Amino acid sequence: MIDQTAFIHPSSIVEDGAIIGAGVHIGPFCYIGSQVEIGAGTVLKSHVVVNGVTKIGRDNEIYQFTSIGEVNQDLKYAGEPTRVEIGDRNRIRESVTIHRGTSQGGGLTKVGSDNLLMINTHIAHDCVVGNRCILANNATLGGHVSVDDFAIIGGMTAVHQFCIIGAHVMVGGCSGVAQDVPPYVVAQGNHATPFGLNIEGLKRRGFEKETLHAIRNAYKLLYRSGKTLDEVKPEIEALAAEHPAVQAFTDFFARSTRGIIR
């Protein structure tokens, strides 16, 4: 179903069954598969491929040579009906690739809203990217990676499969991330190690001084106390009882499966 207010360039192909919302603009030489849904106001500049069972929300900007919803690169994949879901108001720049999920990983690759995916970003099967994240040029997420809200991943950085990048994290460019990065942390290097807290980013997002002080105390317990993670968990939990922002650390520890960067 194609809304009558949508524009589709004559050189583009939209297969029967695709759902194209109001005000969608599909530029030249695009291909839209039969199981694709594109929400109102989304713009495909040119030479964009959207395939598979893929749902794209409203008011996204998708630039040329991007591929969304194609078959993933997991050798175990045997054509199962897996999906891609993308939220609203994302800017997806040139040559980005977002692959469909696998049955082993829950069947869904998901990108939230208000993200900036710069040139040549790769989001592999079963990844979950939150809201208001920035992935700089050539950032690469392996399969099953989670990137939480407000995270920034620098250019040419690779994240190992199954890793978690916590909320408000900043990972420097040309890094290799092989373990989980706790919330609020700045990480850099190959393998990535912690370099303090993303204080400037937190200030810009309205974190108050008292909250920043509590986050600093949690960071010091985690990285400067000389104690193991199991030893500092109760202390961080006690701090979280007084300062809700610290709860992000305890929630993160419960999700972590690869260990945290050191």
UniProtKB/Swiss-Prot annotation:
The keyword ATP-binding belongs to this UniProt entry's keyword annotation: no
Single GO MF descriptor: acyl-[acyl-carrier-protein]-UDP-N-acetylglucosamine O-acyltransferase activity
Reactions catalysed according to its record: a (3R)-hydroxyacyl-[ACP] + UDP-N-acetyl-alpha-D-glucosamine = a UDP-3-O-[(3R)-3-hydroxyacyl]-N-acetyl-alpha-D-glucosamine + holo-[ACP]
Main enzyme class: transferase
Localization of this protein: Cytoplasm
The enzyme's E.C. designation: 2.3.1.129
Domain of life: Bacteria
GO annotation, biological process: lipid A biosynthetic process
Keywords: Acyltransferase, Cytoplasm, Lipid A biosynthesis, Lipid biosynthesis, Lipid metabolism, Repeat, Transferase
Main location: cytoplasm
PROSITE patterns: HEXAPEP_TRANSFERASES
GO cellular component, one term: membrane
InterPro entries (alphabetical): Acetyltransf_C, Acetyltransf_C_sf, Hexapep, Hexapep_transf_CS, Lipid_A_LpxA, Trimer_LpxA-like_sf
Involved pathway(s): Glycolipid biosynthesis; lipid IV(A) biosynthesis; lipid IV(A) from (3R)-3-hydroxytetradecanoyl-[acyl-carrier-protein] and UDP-N-acetyl-alpha-D-glucosamine: step 1/6
Family affiliation: Belongs to the transferase hexapeptide repeat family. LpxA subfamily.
PANTHER family assigned to the protein according to its UniProt record, in alphabetical order: ACYL-[ACYL-CARRIER-PROTEIN]--UDP-N-ACETYLGLUCOSAMINE O-ACYLTRANSFERASE, ACYL-[ACYL-CARRIER-PROTEIN]--UDP-N-ACETYLGLUCOSAMINE O-ACYLTRANSFERASE, MITOCHONDRIAL-RELATED
Subunit details: Homotrimer.
Cited function: Involved in the biosynthesis of lipid A, a phosphorylated glycolipid that anchors the lipopolysaccharide to the outer membrane of the cell.
Protein name listed in UniProt: Acyl-[acyl-carrier-protein]--UDP-N-acetylglucosamine O-acyltransferase
Gene from which the chain derives: lpxA
